[in-house]
């Protein structure tokens, strides 16, 4: 495949496999000319779907494999028996430089384990992080980590801040994102030692984003900052809580607006406004969670995503592949190292001054 940008796709991942993946590709192509696809999985099933979407068929190469990773498969099992599966082959295509990014709607734990095994961690980075794109009052906030690491020390939280800011810049277009550390209060003395230490490091270092300081849980929905950084345990609990609340309110609104003739009339009158609200809160608009920190781009689509949602994940992967976000991460890691060296040596120069000099 000779085109410059190729996306490798696990066509068997998710709850619906090719029946969602292929229509998702067809939708994504409307806004992504010049992108081609490697589709890994059951060749017959993929070809049957491609026959319904000639545009997607014209830019896709099918690579048949007999195995697929189950949605309930444990990461250890996936690594033992995963070689030759659609997920494994999709990630491996990135390592072999056949594709610039991989998208899968498969098992999150298995995808993380296989991706780490095949691609390895990027230089100078300790841990990967999973990103969530969070609809807010002001647009979209990037939240990480939302499940890759149960615990994170100060240096890892700082790395998440650097990776999250680079991602937000690449995908959401903010030239200089604002970053906050999730905490139980905004005062310097609040929170765990790891969070306070990360706060001190970020405050003292000049990076390609603006560090806001501590933020609280309600600041996520307010959109107080562009990027919210936390450990994977806290981030995952926050994400699942928000998803549950969204379903609750959606069901309550639907139940209330169909509770009687007057309520139904009110719903009809407000249908335009309700449609706008539904669009704003539609999770498919913000689907696509990259596994940051790897030597390659891997984007996780929600397993239950529809074609719109899968198209969104493809757009995230494409935006990352076309950006210089990895160079931005490397640049900020060098500034961080320079700041630490300046503080340790006590040479009397400001940390921001030294760090800035490294990047010039």
Curated annotation (Swiss-Prot):
Assembly and oligomerization: Homodimer. Probably interacts with PlsY.
Protein name as it appears in the record: Phosphate acyltransferase
InterPro entries linked: FA_synthesis (IPR003664), Phospholipid_synth_PlsX-like (IPR012281)
Family: Belongs to the PlsX family.
Localization terms from the record: Cytoplasm
GO CC annotations, alphabetized: cytoplasm
Main location: cytoplasm
Species assigned in the record: Caulobacter vibrioides (strain ATCC 19089 / CIP 103742 / CB 15)
UniProt keyword list: Cytoplasm, Lipid biosynthesis, Lipid metabolism, Phospholipid biosynthesis, Phospholipid metabolism, Transferase
GO biological process: fatty acid biosynthetic process; phospholipid biosynthetic process
Enzymatic reactions: a fatty acyl-[ACP] + phosphate = an acyl phosphate + holo-[ACP]
Summary of the function given for this chain in its UniProt record: Catalyzes the reversible formation of acyl-phosphate (acyl-PO(4)) from acyl-[acyl-carrier-protein] (acyl-ACP). This enzyme utilizes acyl-ACP as fatty acyl donor, but not acyl-CoA.
Pathway membership, UniProt: Lipid metabolism; phospholipid metabolism
Gene Ontology molecular functions: phosphate:acyl-[acyl carrier protein] acyltransferase activity
Pfam families named in the record: FA_synthesis (PF02504)
This protein's encoding gene: plsX
EC number(s) on file: 2.3.1.274
Gene3D superfamilies, alphabetized: Isopropylmalate Dehydrogenase
SUPFAM superfamilies referenced in this protein's UniProt entry, alphabetically: Isocitrate/Isopropylmalate dehydrogenase-like
